[in-house]
């Protein structure tokens, strides 16, 4: 979690600010000497982040940059422009759900960048390859149209949960490019009964997360209830985290 305090401007980046990182150890903001473009912290400044890299979208092209990585140089930041996006018929490439990468740097030869757009389109590319171009996948199952994508090192595939969290879909650049690998998820009856209590929530979102330490996959359920009498302010939030084994059992 970061914060940026305005501190001036530069010819290269315009308005800039000092990067501060929230420390979970002491509960305080730790200010760094790193200066970053203020454009990156605007509401529509970025479309996603992965492994410390942030992605921006401008004029139909995605750019990856390491400005918000406190370990990266602010005098010589890395900024990698990807090929212009190609919009599939009856799809859109202006509203992005999120961005994921298969490795820690887009400069790695085998790194694959995935951009999940709201709707049916999922686009993949290898930035380090000389003839880098987008591979566009049309998702046919509407249950994935609003899902967030993540990369599984264990399975070497990009995966996302279906709406409702009942199953997952996984894609790659090989045989699962057009036909995703689907896996049903099985929840304990007691947990299903408890989750039904949140069926009336104003917001329910599902995310897949993989542990970099153990390779285990987790399903994160995020329930939000808003108070209409207080201009829609959040009344309460509830997070539920479940570990998924290789057979799809949630524990």
Language-model regions: role of each:
Residues 229-251:
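Structured C-terminal portions of repeat-based eukaryotic scaffold domains
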Residues 41-232:
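A sequence/structural signal of beta-propeller blade repeats
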Residues 23-26, 88, 129, 243:
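Short acidic, glycine-rich loop/turn motifs
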Residues 28, 130-133, 246-249:
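Structural alpha-beta junctions
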């Amino acid at each position: 979690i970061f914060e940026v305090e305005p501190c001036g401007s530069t010819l290269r980046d315009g308005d800039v600010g000092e990067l501060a990182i929230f420390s979970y150890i002491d509960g305080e903001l730790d200010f760094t000497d790193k200066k970053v473009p203020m454009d990156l912290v605007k509401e529509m400044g970025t479309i996603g982040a992965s492994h410390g890299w942030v992605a921006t979208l401008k004029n139909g092209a995605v750019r990856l940059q390491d400005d918000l990585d406190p370990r990266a140089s602010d005098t010589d930041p890395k900024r990698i422009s990807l090929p212009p996006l190609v919009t599939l018929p009856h799809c859109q490439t202006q509203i992005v759900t999120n961005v994921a990468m298969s490795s820690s740097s887009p400069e790695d030869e085998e790194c694959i960048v995935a951009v999940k757009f709201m709707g049916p389109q999922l686009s993949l590319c290898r930035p380090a390859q000389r003839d880098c171009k987008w591979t566009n996948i049309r998702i046919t199952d509407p249950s994935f149209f609003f899902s967030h994508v993540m990369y599984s090192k264990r399975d070497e595939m990009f995966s996302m949960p279906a709406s409702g969290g009942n199953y997952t879909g996984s894609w790659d650049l090989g045989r699962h490019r057009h036909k995703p690998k689907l896996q049903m998820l099985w929840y304990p009856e007691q947990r299903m009964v408890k989750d039904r209590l949140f069926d009336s929530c104003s917001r329910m979102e599902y995310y897949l997360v993989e542990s970099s330490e153990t390779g285990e996959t987790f399903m994160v359920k995020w329930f939000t209830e808003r108070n209409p009498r207080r201009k829609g302010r959040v009344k309460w939030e509830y997070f539920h985290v479940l570990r998924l084994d290789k057979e799809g059992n949630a524990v």
